[in-house]
Each structure stands twice: as structure tokens, then as C-alpha cells.
């Protein structure tokens, strides 16, 4: 087994900042060819609707149907998939869904208002989105957890109609994905994928209804399409490769740390796994664990490439410095594998999800802990948050003026409007002023 060459950094090095920048750098292939093809696909769907959808589904998914209506999956197929699940799988899926739902319930925003002395009422009205599109990657390697994480918060928010798009290569669908759609309350399912599915959801066809927002992960074509339709519809986020950052005080079993790093590195070659510790001997022990455990992994080659290309081990002087480096990285997943995580977490400002303590494996959050696994990547945790109920609700401002309120506010508004040279604004306010 050849050595796994993982980049080593030390905060004491003069060029540490630039070394860290190089380690974190990831430029999504701004492939003009892909951009062009996706633009063409979106144009086809906008122009030809159902006919284009049927043709593109046959071309890209090798799934041939006579009409677009045949792309929709009857609701009883979802129920049958759920009923046919082995009891243990059904129990695990239900438990995960219930935990995600319980967490999401606490995120709900409520409308509020307050009244001023003159009777004027000001407030905020919370309304769920009318219709949301959920994209789910298809084929055999499907992700039922992704269905739960996207669908359950939408339903908790009160979204009346949830439309799922899932590609069916050669007509094949994953039963677990359909079962997850059933128990999380998905309303309609279309067997469509790629940029053509995103375009159909964004603009609508004769058969596929137009949605207000599109959520869910996908390949580079799906991500590019989501970017291009943003503005026509809302999107959740443009996700980069998966990331994990582990801060260890040196007292966690090195095998545990190695496997936690593997858990993200196995996603794909661009995934990033980084370990930070003030204990140099611990970094060596984890390196040894990596080399011992890697040959037994199912996705050993992907993990090796990911660790050698984008992995890192960072030696720091103390845990406070570790927190400062973590804030600079702003990771998607952050594990605090330390004695007192509740103390260290106070220093963390930028992270998608924070896993506190040695026993809290990031994988638990991926599947069933409760918090959402759709998280900001590529440093966007500096200004973004995990997917949640609030992503499926919108806020409207409420203003009600009593006659007295209109009199008072009208005088202020009139002065400001004339100052801006907007006479109609000023007069509109003045008409409601009481002339005593």
C-alpha cells in the first residue's frame, strides 16, 4: 500500500495564509460548452414544452414514452414502493422522517403584528410558497435521505404542492426513493432529469406545472440549469463538493477520525476532508490509521484521490487557533472532537453544521439526527445557512393606517417625497392629511 500524500500545513509558517488559500481553492469548471448546451436545452423546453421533454428524456435517459403524461408516476406506485419495503428499512426511513419533521417544526416562522397608539397596525405575514419542485438524482445510486431532507421541511412549512423530478435511466427507479417520497408527502412525481427537468419546473410545460422554487442536488448540468433559471424561480443554493473539517484535541481514537475523514472523501474526488489539531503526534497517528484502513474501503480509490488532491492536516498552537482557522475555512460540516465542545463552539462563527463531541459522527447528521443535511459549501457558510422550513416560507409586510395614523405619517411622507422631487407621492400622502 503506497503512502497517502496529504498536504501538511502549520499555522506558524510565514506563508500559512497563502498555503491555506491554495488548499481551499476550488474552481468549478466554468465549462462554456456545458453552459451553452444547458442554455439550448432550456430554450427547447420553453419553446416546445412537452414534445421537447419527451424527446430529451429519450435522448439522455434512454427512456421512451409516447406522451409527456406517461412521464408522471401514479401516486399508488409510491404507496406500493413503501408497502414493499423490508420492515427494517421502512422503520429506519420512518424514524429519520419523524426526527427531521420534529426539528423542522421548531423552525416555523409565525406571523406577528403590533398596534401603535393612534391605531396604526404594522406587522409581518408568513405565507408558504404555493408550489415547490424537488430535484432528486436518479438511477440505482439514489439518495432517499435527500428526499426526506428536502421534502419534509417544505411540507412542515405548509407548501400545498410538492413536485418531484427524478430521472429514470432506461425506466429504472430506486424503490427507496419512491418510498421516501411517499412518507414525506410528495404530491406528484415526474420521471424526468437533467437540465430539461429543471427547465420544465421553472417554466412549466403542458403537463409539468411551473413551480416557485427548485431545491435538491444534481450533477453539473442540473447545477448550471438552476443557476440559469434563478430569477424566474427561487433556488436553494448552488452546491459545491462535500467538505468536512475535524478539530481534534488529540485524545480521540485516530481510527475514528480517519473514518470520519473518509466519510466525506468517498463522495467524489473533489470532496475535501481536513483535520486540525494542536497535537503533532496525533496527526501522525491519524495518517497511520488512514493508510491501514484505506485498503478495506469500498471506494478506496475515490477516497485516496480526494485526500491527495484536496485533503489537509493542519497543525495549530492551541484550540483557539483551531477555531480561528475553522472560521476562515467556513466548512460545510465541522466536527469538534474535543473534551469540552460546548466551550469551543462559542468561538465558531462560520460552519454549516457543527457536530459536538467525540461520539457525534458527521454521518449521523447526514441521515437521521434531525437537522438538515443540505448545507452551504465552498466557504459560503460565511453568509448562508442550512436548508430549513424558512426556505419554503416568505414574508410580507403589513401596514394598516388609521385616519389619525395617516394624518401623522402623511406629513412625514410628504416632506420626504417633495425632497426627492416626487410630486405624486407627496400629493398621495397629502390627500389623507386632515386639514383642521
Swiss-Prot record:
UniProt binding sites for NAD(+): 135, 196, 219
Pathway: Amino-acid biosynthesis; L-histidine biosynthesis; L-histidine from 5-phospho-alpha-D-ribose 1-diphosphate: step 9/9
Amino acids binding Zn(2+): 264, 267, 366, 425
Manner of cofactor binding, per the entry note: Binds 1 zinc ion per subunit.
Keywords: Amino-acid biosynthesis, Histidine biosynthesis, Metal-binding, NAD, Oxidoreductase, Zinc
InterPro entries in alphabetical order: Ald_DH/histidinol_DH, Histidinol_DH_CS, Histidinol_DH_monofunct, Hstdl_DH
Gene3D superfamilies attached to this UniProt entry: 1.20.5.1300, Nitrogenase molybdenum iron protein domain
Binding residues for substrate: 242, 264, 267, 333, 366, 420, 425
Gene Ontology BP annotations: L-histidine biosynthetic process
Pfam families in alphabetical order: Histidinol_dh
One Gene Ontology term, aspect cellular component: cytosol
Signal peptide annotation: none
Highest taxon listed in the record's lineage: Bacteria
EC number(s) given by UniProt: 1.1.1.23
CDD domains for this protein: Histidinol_dh
NCBIfam families: hisD
Family: Belongs to the histidinol dehydrogenase family.
Name this polypeptide is given: Histidinol dehydrogenase
Organism of this sequence: Methylococcus capsulatus (strain ATCC 33009 / NCIMB 11132 / Bath)
Gene expressing this chain: hisD
